[in-house]
Design a protein with these regions (language model features):
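Short flexible coil/turn linkers enriched for glycine and charged/polar residues
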Residues: 13, 25-27, 64-65, 75-77, ...
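Active/ligand-binding-proximal structured segments within catalytic/core domains
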Residues: 36-52, 76-127, 356, 360-361
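Conserved nucleotide-binding/hydrolysis modules and their immediate coupling elements
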Residues: 1-79
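Short amphipathic
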Residues: 18-21, 156-159, 289-298
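Functional cores that coordinate and move charged inorganic groups
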Residues: 89, 109-214
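A generic structural motif
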Residues: 30-31, 64-73, 125-131, 331-332, ...
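Terminal appendage regions of diverse proteins
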Residues: 209-384
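Short, hydrophobic/aliphatic alpha-helical segments
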Residues: 21-37, 79-90, 175-187, 337-355, ...
Length: 384
């Protein structure tokens, strides 16, 4: 049985312990100590890393009451070693874990949402809820959670006796038996084996970075503490850059983007009208009944499609339009009424390092090799 120093004081960074055993295992050595401050992976929280004497601690696991440290070099059974945690990593895990408890508690109190999944990953914490939530509900829960952070109240970790536990209202993902460790933080009470901060104020900030519907509920990406500060600072830097690019005053990004979006829609409509005019002019000049291959300068993929379809409708014959595209040529290939150009498209791609495809009546793609004259000769031979 390993004495768990982190359960008594989660701020222990350095300690001494006696090596109980050391066994070679794949990837290192399995070391058991009589006592440890290293937290083993579990409950969504990653394990601690650091050093035991001259050995690096690579991973920490538990199989009940015994905690095993995987090290890169062996230790000697019976020797006394000094343990040292990677403190910045542990402090980060504590900020994320305590922050998650506070936010989960707010979601539960306000909307009855259960936390059904939790993992401290990188760069964000993943939280899964049992029910769908709106953006407004998430914002409300985030605000309440940060109010609890600002209140800077104590975080209490304890193991109540069975009678006290029976009359205590607490959150838990599963039914528990035996000793149950509870963590009270920011008005929330939850069963938890992890390490936590001493006060809610040490969390600093809780920020929901993104959210999406997942299964029957929501999946949230959350940042707490330094991670939240870094995320907000990064978002603010992007926002400042957008203000400058749009020549928009501070605080007016949304109206500027709406103007940009409306202007883009107007330009797209104007471009479509011009491409229709071009398509009609090209169709007017086309010879009825004859396959056509022509160069259309300045047209995008949609423009090439419009011209090819207009000519085919006029001539009742297949037509291929080509124009500049990336490092080569872009093409749009329209079949005569009732025709199928898929085999021609396949052969064209094979001959000129092309990519693309489509339906029997129309195919579209790009060619990495071949000049317009070469492709034109190939197509006229294939379409005739």
């Amino acid at each position: 049985m390993t004495e768990k120093l982190y359960e008594v004081d989660s701020y222990v960074q350095n300690f001494t312990a006696q090596v109980v055993s050391c066994t070679p295992v794949p990837g290192g050595f399995a070391v058991v100590l009589d006592r440890t401050a290293f937290f083993p992976e579990g409950g969504g929280q990653p394990c601690d890393t650091g050093r035991l004497g001259g050995a690096r601690v690579l991973a920490v696991h538990t199989d009940g009451e015994t905690i095993t440290h995987t090290t890169d070099t062996p230790l000697t059974a019976g020797e006394t070693v000094d343990g040292c945690l990677d403190w910045p990593a542990r402090l980060d895990a504590m900020q994320q874990h305590t922050g998650e408890h506070i936010l989960s508690g707010a979601l539960h109190r306000l909307f009855g949402a259960e936390n059904v999944g939790f993992h401290i990953g990188s760069p964000y914490v993943r939280m899964d809820t049992s029910i769908p939530l709106t953006q407004e509900q998430l914002a409300q829960a985030e605000a309440e959670a940060n109010a609890a952070v600002r209140a800077d109240t104590p975080v209490h970790c304890w193991v109540p006796d069975p009678e006290t536990l029976a009359r205590t209202d607490y959150r838990s993902k599963k039914e528990l038996t035996g000793d149950v460790r509870l963590v009270e933080a920011g008005g929330d009470c939850c069963a938890c084996c992890g390490t936590h901060l001493a006060r809610t104020g040490e969390v600093g900030l809780i920020k929901i970075i993104s959210f999406a519907h997942y299964k029957s509920g929501m999946r949230l990406a959350v940042a707490c503490g330094q991670r939240a500060y870094d995320a907000v600072a990064g978002i603010w830097a992007d926002t400042e850059a957008a203000w400058r690019l749009l020549s928009s005053p501070v605080g007016s990004l949304t109206p500027a983007l709406e103007r940009l979006q409306n202007g883009e829609a107007a330009l797209k409509a104007r471009l479509a009208a011009l491409q229709n005019t071009l398509a009609a002019a090209c169709a007017e000049a086309a010879a009825p009944g004859a396959p056509a291959v022509l160069w259309v300068d300045g047209a995008d993929g949609d423009g090439l499609r419009r011209v090819a379809m207009a000519i085919t409708a006029k001539t009742n014959a297949p037509c291929c339009t080509l124009g500049p595209g990336g490092q080569g040529l872009a093409y749009a290939l329209a079949a005569a009424p009732g025709g199928d150009v898929r085999e021609t498209c396949k052969a064209l791609n094979a001959a000129y390092q092309g990519r693309g495809g489509g339906k029997p009546g129309f195919c579209q793609g790009s060619l990495a090799e071949g000049s317009f004259e070469q492709v034109k000769a190939f197509l006229l031979k294939s379409l005739t």
